[in-house]
């Protein structure tokens, strides 16, 4: 959630309110019913909903929610979600690591090494940023393929997500 508040309810019994800085990880697995609702008619919700395919089928449904402070991503890559739930991130059933950053003018470069065969993807939520030499503005994204790292620099009030994507997507059958 980027702005506003969103109330969550699901068929597994989870309820809660998501606020700015909160990240929710929901695994549909074998099935779950859920709803998200903004109860405040005067304050819109600004959020991102990101769907990732799991590494395998038939996993049980799951839910987790965590708050990530703005200070934790200022001028650094803050882990939000990864397969092992390491470094304070939420765990996920996919070979993906998702990081967030807030960068501004004068910040040092941020680098994410990509293991052989992995891809990077950067989504710029707000501001402006240079990614591997390509200047992007709010709402833009860059796919990084065939390179060994992702380099973020020259941020201007930049709020970005960086995805480190694995090599084994779920094959549709």
What are these regions (language model features)?
Residues 1-173:
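Jelly-roll (double-stranded beta-helix
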């Amino acid at each position: 959630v980027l702005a506003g508040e969103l109330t969550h309810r699901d068929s597994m019994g989870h309820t809660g309110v998501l606020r700015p800085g909160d990240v929710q990880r929901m695994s549909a697995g074998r099935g779950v019913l859920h709803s998200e609702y903004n109860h405040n008619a005067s304050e819109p919700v600004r959020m991102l909903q990101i769907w990732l395919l799991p590494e395998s089928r038939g996993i049980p449904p799951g839910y987790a929610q965590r708050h990530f402070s703005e200070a934790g991503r200022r001028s650094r890559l803050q882990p939000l979600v990864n397969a092992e739930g390491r470094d304070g991130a939420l765990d996920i059933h996919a070979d993906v690591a998702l990081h967030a950053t807030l960068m501004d003018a004068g910040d040092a470069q941020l680098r994410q090494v990509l293991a052989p065969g992995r891809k990077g993807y950067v989504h710029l939520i707000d501001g402006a940023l240079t990614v591997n030499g390509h200047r992007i503005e709010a709402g833009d994204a860059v796919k990084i393929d065939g390179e060994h790292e992702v380099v973020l620099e020259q941020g201007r009030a930049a709020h970005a997500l960086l995805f480190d994507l694995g090599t084994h997507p779920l094959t549709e059958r």
